């Protein structure tokens, strides 16, 4: 059975992608549905003053994993080469590069200490083809982001496209890992569930229509910060973000992605509670 030793608790780490701190009920947002994130906040600790090492995906993730700032670990921007992307998109002809080679991640330490480590979801720190940093279970997204349906994935058999909604699939794989741990001896586990949600795309065809339509038709989005200056690349590429309908469409997909991610967090919490492991699992 997974660990019931209170000195060696199990660990579940959920990482979302591009989620604003205002997008939860526990943060005062009355329009979005996040009962499970609110449930965690009510029984745990919610930081109100928190700083990220980088506003960009790959360096921020590398900092979380290594405890180092970008100038120390060397990843300064989102990775477009040397990753599985280079091999998946044949025209790039790039080699696979493990950008954090030679650096210790906290999952390395956990694995060395006897933890069984599993990762389901987004990696985006180089060479997604091969398990790294102490992980023995490895079912990850090929790229740094992409479609919610037919998402490119990699497992032990190579790359494939997943037809189902990818947020659900990440959780399916996470529960597969947990089930295997529940059948093992008293070994603590670490599970990383790295959702691509709520990163774009946000169009209706990328998400379950019923939820997208509910937000599009019913939500005033008054809880969403407005009037912020768009990122430089948004202005440079001329991406429309200021007209009312474009804003409503984007936010409908954004809120949908968060609500459905929250529902999947609930699936993991429910599994832990059903197995009697919730009290001995850091979440």
Where would I find each of the regions flagged by the language model?
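Active-site-proximal cap/lid insertion segments
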Residues: 3-9, 16-32, 142-282
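Extracellular/periplasmic catalytic domains that process cell-envelope and extracellular macromolecules
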Residues: 4-8, 33, 39-42, 56-58, ...
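Active-site segment of extracytoplasmic enzymes that catalyze sulfate/phosphate-ester chemistry
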Residues: 13-14, 20-118, 137, 143
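Secretory-pathway/luminal and periplasmic proteins that interact with or process carbohydrate-rich
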Residues: 47, 71-73, 129, 198-204
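Short aromatic-enriched loop/helix-cap "lid" or pocket-rim segments at secondary-structure transitions
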Residues: 52, 62, 129-133, 149-151, ...
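Short, structured coil segments at secondary-structure junctions
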Residues: 133-134, 175
């Amino acid at each position: 059975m997974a660990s019931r030793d209170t000195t060696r608790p199990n660990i579940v780490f959920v990482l979302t992608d591009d989620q604003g701190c205002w997008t939860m009920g526990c943060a005062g947002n009355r329009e979005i549905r996040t009962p499970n994130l609110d449930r965690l906040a009510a029984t745990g600790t919610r930081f109100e003053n928190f700083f990220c090492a980088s506003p960009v995906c790959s360096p921020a993730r590398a900092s979380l994993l290594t405890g180092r700032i970008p100038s120390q670990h060397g990843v300064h921007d989102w990775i477009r080469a040397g990753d599985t992307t280079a091999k998946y998109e044949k025209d790039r002809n790039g080699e696979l590069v493990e950008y954090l080679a030679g650096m210790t991640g906290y999952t390395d330490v956990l694995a060395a200490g006897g933890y069984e480590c599993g990762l389901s979801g987004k990696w985006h720190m180089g060479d997604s083809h091969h398990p790294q940093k102490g992980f023995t279970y490895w079912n990850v997204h090929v790229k740094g982001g992409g479609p919610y349906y037919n998402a490119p994935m990699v497992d032990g058999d190579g790359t494939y496209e997943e037809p189902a909604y990818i947020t659900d699939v990440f959780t399916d794989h996470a529960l597969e890992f947990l089930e295997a741990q529940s059948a093992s001896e008293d070994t603590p586990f670490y599970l990383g569930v790295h959702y691509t949600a709520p990163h774009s795309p946000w169009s209706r065809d990328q998400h379950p229509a019923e939820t997208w339509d509910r937000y599009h038709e019913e939500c005033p989005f008054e809880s969403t910060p407005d009037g912020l200056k768009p990122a430089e690349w948004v202005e440079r590429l001329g991406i429309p973000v200021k007209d009312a309908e474009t804003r409503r469409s984007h936010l409908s997909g954004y809120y949908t992605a968060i609500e459905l991610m929250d529902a999947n967090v609930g699936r993991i919490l429910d599994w832990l509670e059903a197995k009697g492991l919730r009290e001995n699992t850091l979440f």
